[in-house]
């Protein structure tokens, strides 16, 4: 797991869903692992990969294959995501559509609707009163400068926690 200590509570005012949209775009390539090659390599070296954004954090989960080279490759890819992510405008519309579908699926569940209404009643339409996934009008208003600024501000070693568990050589990983 790589956990960034930033979530939807850090979304700029009027830009709800920015942290979640960035999470989606963070699978689309870096300076050294271009475009969809990033996701292809994640798929090659993991049994499963996923991500989520909540109010306080953004998490990237990788269940790494048991081959010795797999862990090193995933650590490399996560370091690329942390320091060399390339955000591309061409992916934004399709990722907004995915976020929109995720929101529809979530809001199709009665408990989620209840929680959303309770949080809105308690906090209004800001901070904890809005879902981390954001609202469509706000998502559509997010621009590349805002995404890049959020990334540069929050995706950094001093704002991340990496958790590695399983059978591996601790000394080798730390080197």
Question: Which residues does each PLM region occupy?
Answer:
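Non-catalytic, conformational "gating/processing" segments within enzyme and secreted inhibitor domains
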Residues: 111, 144, 148-175
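Acidic/histidine-enriched alpha-helical segments
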Residues: 39, 86-104, 169
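M16 family metallopeptidases and their MPP-like homologs
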Residues: 1-21, 36-80, 111-137, 159-165
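M16/insulysin-pitrilysin zinc metalloprotease superfamily fold
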Residues: 29-32, 63-96, 174
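Active-site-flanking alpha-helical
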Residues: 23-27
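Hydrophobic alpha-helical scaffolding
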Residues: 85, 104, 108, 137-140, ...
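Short amphipathic beta-strand starts and helix->beta connectors
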Residues: 43-47, 141-149
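Short acidic/His-enriched helical or mixed secondary-structure segments at domain edges of catalytic enzymes
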Residues: 98-117
């Amino acid at each position: 797991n790589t956990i960034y200590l930033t979530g939807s509570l850090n979304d700029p005012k009027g830009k709800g869903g920015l942290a979640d949209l960035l999470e989606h775009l963070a699978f689309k390539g870096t300076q050294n692992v271009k475009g969809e090659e990033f996701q292809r390599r994640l798929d090659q070296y993991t049994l499963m990969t996923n991500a989520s954004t909540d109010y306080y954090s953004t998490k990237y989960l990788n269940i790494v294959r048991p081959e010795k080279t797999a862990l090193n490759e995933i650590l490399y890819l996560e370091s690329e995501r942390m320091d060399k992510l390339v955000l591309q405008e061409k992916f934004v519309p399709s990722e907004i559509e995915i976020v929109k579908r995720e929101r529809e699926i979530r809001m199709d569940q009665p408990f989620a609707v209840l929680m959303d209404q309770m949080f809105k009643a308690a906090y209004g339409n800001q901070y904890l009163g809005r879902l981390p996934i954001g609202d469509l009008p706000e998502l559509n208003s997010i621009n590349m400068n805002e995404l890049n600024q959020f990334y540069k501000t929050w995706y950094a070693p001093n704002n991340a926690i990496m958790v590695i568990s399983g059978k591996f050589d601790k000394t080798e990983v730390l080197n």
